């Protein structure tokens, strides 16, 4: 399910890791229909294909991963089965894209955040409701939930019609240093997974939420391929590092969005 990684460019660079912008949750199970009311699905045209996931955090704003952006993205809210449309399913497109450019010292890996303003507000319904930004950080060792329409196998690009969910665990960021020698792994990123292997996010899970202790703590960012390898957790962007920036953008303070 959450095996989201953008492999193409990384394979060209002959790197052993990949962005999760096209992965599914491996080792997961179909999410409960009422478990993911905030989950957004990004589709692109030509050809019409599922791209990534995102999280509805406000009636008119979706938070995702910057590496997922494509021109002309269609954003679906309230979707569960891609083949069966709910009556309250809503389709939107972005009229504004915002990227974190506040700290030039940060690498692209540390600011893989994208905030999209929808063309019109989304109506709350049976299958749609926003997810709040975190009020406090989780502890290392916390159990977290990941979800997405990413690939379900670490060896075959098999995409599901329905989102899959899985439980993983926050581990010390040092666990991600060795598996990702080409990424500056810092405390600005969450390192999470199942060290025994078998459960992970993967291709096209990118941009989806990492929910720990009921709070939206991370955004699916990067991981090694094949996904779900033992002692190879994945990396997630820490939402708490960007809450002030997000709130300022939503409030219309685009010229003063960066924290002092």
Curated annotation (Swiss-Prot):
It holds the Pfam family Trypsin. InterPro entries: Peptidase_S1_PA, Peptidase_S1_PA_chymotrypsin, Peptidase_S1A, Trypsin_dom. Monomer. Residues 25-251 form the Peptidase S1 domain. Residues 1-18 form the signal peptide. This is Snake venom serine protease Dav-X. Residues 19-24 form a propeptide. Belongs to the peptidase S1 family. Snake venom subfamily.
